[in-house]
């Protein structure tokens, strides 16, 4: 299974915003594109990460469990890029 780093970022931002429109705006993508990427991630992991309703978005227990791991991956990736720029 290969999960691109940008999808991990999408997950983290949506988990922070809990709103597809605001998260998509922060990520400079469209809400439908964000929704599609999150759905693909859920399919890859075979778990539901967000409960979606017309009025709100909430993390599921799986989403809450994944969030610290995803943030760590994102931070490690950022450090790797920073190190690469400094050498």
For the regions a language model picked out, list residue spans one by one.
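Alpha-helical linker/hinge and terminal dimerization helices associated
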Residues: 44-45, 66-87
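A short LG(V/I)-centered, amphipathic sequence patch enriched
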Residues: 42-59
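Short, conserved clusters of charged catalytic residues that mark active-site
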Residues: 6, 58, 79
